[in-house]
Each structure stands twice: as C-alpha cells, then as structure tokens.
C-alpha cells in the first residue's frame, strides 16, 4: 500500500485537503485526531504529560487549555511535549496502516503536521505539502479560528518555513483559491499516485 505523507503549516487547509483523497479510495490518517484521542483516552500518556506538566490532567484527561497556557508562557517546552506525544502517535499510526493494508486500500494519506520536522518523510513513499499565502493563512487562523496572534507566531516558530516545505515536497497543493480548484489539484495528484509502486511499508515498517 502506498504511503503518502501530507503536511502543511497551521491554517493551510491541510486536513480539509487530506479528506478530499477519500473520494479516490485513499484511507486518511489524521495525526491531530490521534493526539486528541490520546489526550482523552491513553492513561499512560496522560500520566506522563501530567508528570511533565503538573495540573494538565483534569477529570482524567489532558486539558488542552492548560497545556496551551503553559506553552504560551514557555514555548521552549513544545519540544518536551512532542517527545512524549510523537512516539505514541507513531504506534497508533502503524496500527492504522496495518488495518488499511488488511482492507486492501490502494493508499494511505498520513496527515502529519510535523512530517519534515520529525524526519517522517523517510517513512513514506511520497510527500505532499498543502500551502497558501501568508494573508490567507492569517485570515483562517486569527480571524476565523480566533487563535491568539502571539500563540500563532509561537506555533509557526516550531514549524519549518512554508517555502522550505514546498521545496522538499514531491507535490504541492495550493488552497488559495476555491474548493473546486483544490479538488482538481487533488484529483490530478491522486491519478499520479495510483501509478506508483509502494516501497516504504516493506522498507521501514514491515520488518
């Protein structure tokens, strides 16, 4: 099964674009959804986070508001949190891929925000970056989502610059225009992906 790493900075429309690949029989794994699941259900990880970030465990779950407040005061602790979360999400990711292989899906879109930052491109067959202009990104994140501007800048500081991501990607999808335009780009890329020979699973996972 072909493994496609799809990434993009915050506010680029990454997850919306990833979901479009479902129309072309690709399975979609969402790393952010996995993190949310872990915060609410994975007791081992919840307790590890509580040890590193006292007070983050509220009613048996990780409080994202508490974490957000702590990280906004001390952005350097992003790395500490990631060191706990990323190994856990990787195990969930591998489990998902195995399930999709059993279902004989033609490919799996791995929607991973920090694909390049964590070296994840080594473990996929193809990388796709979703991009948009700085103005569009700001509009979505600040005006539509209501994210604090300082926190937005702190998140960006943890992510690889958009231009560098685009340069490293095998394919780039722009979400500057309307949804129909993005969908056409997805259709074009999906048609190319189905012709590729899967290698990443056997090379890096199935050992």
Put a short name on every predicted segment.
Residues 15:
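Walker A/P-loop
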Residues 10:
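The conserved Walker
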Residues 22-31, 43-44:
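Post-Walker A helix-loop "phosphate-sensing" segment adjacent to the P-loop in P-loop NTPases
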Residues 94-103, 107-144:
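ATP-dependent NMP and nucleoside kinases share a basic, alpha-helical "lid"
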Residues 93, 122-123, 143, 147-194, ...:
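Small-molecule kinase domains that catalyze NTP-dependent phosphoryl transfer to phosphate-bearing small molecules
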Residues 33-105:
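ATP-dependent small-molecule kinase phosphotransfer cores
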Residues 6:
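Hydrophobic anchor at the beta1->P-loop junction of P-loop NTPases
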């Amino acid at each position: 099964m072909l493994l496609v790493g799809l990434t993009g900075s915050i506010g680029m429309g990454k997850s919306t674009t990833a979901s479009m690949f479902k129309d072309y029989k690709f399975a979609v794994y969402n790393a952010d959804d996995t993190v949310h699941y872990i915060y609410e259900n994975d007791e081992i990880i919840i307790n590890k986070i509580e040890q590193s970030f006292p007070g983050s465990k509220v009613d048996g779950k990780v409080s994202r508001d508490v974490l957000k407040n702590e990280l906004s005061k001390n952005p350097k602790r992003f790395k500490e949190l990631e060191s706990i979360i990323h190994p856990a999400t990787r195990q969930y990711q591998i489990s998902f891929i195995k399930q999709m292989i059993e279902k004989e899906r033609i490919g799996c879109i791995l929607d991973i925000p920090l694909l390049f930052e964590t070296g994840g491109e080594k473990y996929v067959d193809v990388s796709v970056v979703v991009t948009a202009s700085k103005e569009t990104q700001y509009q979505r994140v600040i005006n539509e989502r209501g994210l604090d501007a300082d926190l937005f800048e702190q998140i960006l500081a943890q992510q690889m610059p958009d231009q560098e991501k685009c340069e490293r990607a095998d394919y780039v999808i722009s979400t500057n225009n309307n949804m129909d335009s993005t969908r056409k780009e997805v259709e074009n890329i999906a048609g190319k992906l189905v012709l590729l020979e899967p290698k990443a699973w056997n090379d890096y996972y199935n050992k």
